[in-house]
Amino acid sequence: VSASTLNDAFTKISETMGDDFKRRVLNDDGTPRSLINIYINGKNAKFSSGLDTKLSDGDEVYILPAVAGGSHDTGEGVSDLSEKELDRYSRQIMLEEIGYQGQLKLKQAKVCVVGVGGLGNPIVTRLAAMGVGNIRIVDRDVIELSNLHRQTMFNEEDVGQVKVETAAKKLRKLNPNVVIEELPVSINDYTAVDVVDGCDVVVDALDSVDARYALNKACIEKKIPFVTGAAVGVTGQSFTILPNESACYHCLFPALDEDS
C-alpha cells in the first residue's frame, strides 16, 4: 500500500482486509490492540514514534497478532503466543521460513537431544533460546575440567556435577517457558526406545558408535525423525534420517566400531 505514516497504512490495510482484520488487530477506535506487535524493517514500532512513524518507499511492515485463528491452530493446548513470546522471538518470526505458525510449531514440539557435550551444548542452548516447548536432554557423564573449552554452558564451579542436571538448571534460566526433562542414563539397546518415546525429533550428539546404532534402531522402530552429527578434529558430518523414507544410520555405516 501507499502510505506516509504507520497510521495511514493501518487505515488502508483495514479497508482492504475487511472486518476480520479489524476484529483481530484493531480496537474500536482504530488503534492497534495491545497484543499486537508492529515491526518496521525489523525495528519494533513501539520504540519509534508509534502510529505517527513516517514510512518511506520500500519499507516493510510486519503485523504480528498474539492470537492465532481458526484452522491455523497447530496443536493440542498451544493455540497462540503471548505478547512476551512475540517480542522474545520477533526476529525469527519475521523469517518467511518460520513466521507465526512456525513459532507455534516450535512451542508445541518435543525434541530429544542425546549427548550434552561438545555438540549437544550449543544444540540444547539454541533450541531453548528459540522457544522449543519441551526439550529432553540425555547424558550420563559428569562435567570435567577438560570439557570447559568447548562446552561453554559449563564453568569451573560445575566440574564434578552431572551434565544433564547442570544443563537443565541453566536452560531453565535461559528460557523459563521451556520444559526441560533430564535423563542421566546410558544409551543402549535396552534403554533407547524409552528415551526417545513421545518425542517429535531426536538429535544425536553422541560420541559413541554403539550408542548411535541403538538410537538409530529405536528411532526407526518409533518412526521418529533422527538428526545425527559427529565431529573428529576439525571435520564433521550431519544428516537427517526419516524412517521409511530415507536410509538409516546402519544402512549408511553398517560396520563401524568404537576403534574405527
Name each model-derived stretch.
Residues D73-S260:
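Adenine nucleotide-associated cytosolic modules
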